Amino acid sequence: VATWIGKSGRTLVYGGSRAGLMETLATTVRENGGRVIGVVPQAVVNRDLVSDASTTVFYTADLQDRKSTFMRESEAFVALPGGIGTLDEVFTVLAAKTLEKYKRRVVLYNAGGCWDELIKMIDTLSANGLITERREDLLSVANNIEELERLLSE
């Protein structure tokens, strides 16, 4: 994913921390010619975890401000396999999308079936009328890099 982002001249907008998998992603994007925007909450600054991989950095007061900056600065939202923070970001973006405050493409990169249960849950919520939107209208699913490339090129 990172190599494709960089080589296709795209920009990665991410949390700006040097911890974890996203640091590797950011470094690889940059090594392959892409821009990297780090959106760094004060908590990351306080823990001295700010990455050097970013070409541009936005500092935010907190996680809510960070998510708002993600949405403002991004052309699309792609969720790679992740944990609680990723789920928080996914649901924040989907909630904004249902209120028509975020109109860009949302993609779950479903590597190894990571998002299968979440996809089923959203389909069930929609089928039961608990959310009015169909999943297909809220988000797309890419099961491999070719599908991700196609979705982001549309």
Where are these regions (language model features)?
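Short acidic active-site motifs
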Residues: 21, 65-66, 147
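Glycine-rich oxoanion-binding loops at beta->alpha junctions
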Residues: 39-77
